[in-house]
Amino acid sequence: MDPTCSSECIYNLIPSDLKEPPQPPRYISIFKATVKDDMQKAKTAMKTMGPAKVEVPSPKDFLKKHSKEKTLPPKKNFDRNVPKKPAVPLKTDHPVMGIQSGKNFINTNAADIIMGVAKKPKPIYVDKRTGDKHDLEPSGLVPKYINKKDYGVTPEYICKRNEEIKKAQEDYDRYIQENLKKAAMKRLSDEEREAVLQGLKKNWEEVHKEFQSLSVFIDSIPKKIRKQRLEEEMKQLEHDIGIIEKHKIIYIANNA
């Protein structure tokens, strides 16, 4: 029997819609993940345009001449008195081998860690959101000076300076008082008063005698000047004699 006869059917005469063949699976490279990772590594955020907000440089920090040049390290002076390092051991010297120690380093280290004092972290402060850290102690944020015992106390050198100034002022005042006492008024004794009075009278007599010896006619300028001078001297001497005779007690400046 013909095998094609079994496939014959009346329904095969009905025209059927053509079906498109299924598409093959989409190609996916096996290196896709590797390529993505390489691209992410090569990229950097804000690399071409820079960060959004940047601190503006201060005009005081301008670029100075030779500031970009490399500076040599400070020169060290060679000291010949410094002892030399120990010599390198010879090739023939062999170190002692086989020495062993019975110390248990594991237990020793564990005991040192348990009994030791924990290391305190260094105090710092952060001033930006990006995490810039600085030492806290030299920043001035810690009230270090107001907690000192000698805070608000006058320094010792100022107290010493004030004492020296006070002592110098006292010495100066004492010197002035001594000079005032030396220059104080002293009283004339009766003998001294009488001697002064007699001396003034004697001077008056001499001036009066000279005045009496003048010519009768004063017909020249020198004669007039001489007469006026003698009259003034006699008048001053008479005034002094009158004061001394009037006052029995007289004080004079002590210039000794």
From Swiss-Prot:
Q: Which PANTHER family match?
A: ENKURIN, ENKURIN-RELATED
Where is this protein primarily located? Answer: cytoplasm
Q: Which GO terms describe its cellular component?
A: 9+0 motile cilium; 9+2 motile cilium; acrosomal vesicle; axonemal B tubule inner sheath; axonemal microtubule; sperm flagellum; sperm principal piece
The Swiss-Prot or TrEMBL record annotates one GO molecular function as: calmodulin binding
Sorted alphabetically, the keyword list is: Calmodulin-binding, Cell projection, Cilium, Cytoplasm, Cytoskeleton, Flagellum, SH3-binding
- Alphabetized PROSITE patterns for the sequence: ENKURIN (PS51665)
Descriptive protein name: Enkurin
Q: Where's the Enkurin domain?
A: 160-252
Q: Which organism is it from?
A: Homo sapiens
Q: Where is this motif: SH3-binding?
A: 83-89
Residue intervals of the IQ domain: 176-187
Compartment(s): Cytoplasm, Cytoskeleton, Cilium axoneme; Cytoplasm, Cytoskeleton, Flagellum axoneme
Q: Where is this region: Interaction with TRPC proteins?
A: 160-255
Might you name a Gene Ontology BP term for this protein?
A: flagellated sperm motility
Its domain comment says: The IQ motif is involved in calmodulin binding.
Pfam families under this entry?
A: Enkurin (PF13864)
Tissue expression: Expressed in airway epithelial cells.
Q: Is Nucleotidyltransferase set as a keyword in this record?
A: no
Q: What does this protein do?
A: Adapter that functions to localize a calcium-sensitive signal transduction machinery in sperm to a calcium-permeable ion channel. Microtubule inner protein (MIP) part of the dynein-decorated doublet microtubules (DMTs) in cilia axoneme, which is required for motile cilia beating.
> Its quaternary structure?
Microtubule inner protein component of sperm flagellar doublet microtubules. Binds calmodulin via its IQ domain. Interacts with TRPC1, TRPC2, TRPC5, but not TRPC3. Interacts with CFAP45.
UniProt-listed InterPro entries: Enkurin_dom (IPR027012), Enkurin_domain-protein (IPR052102)
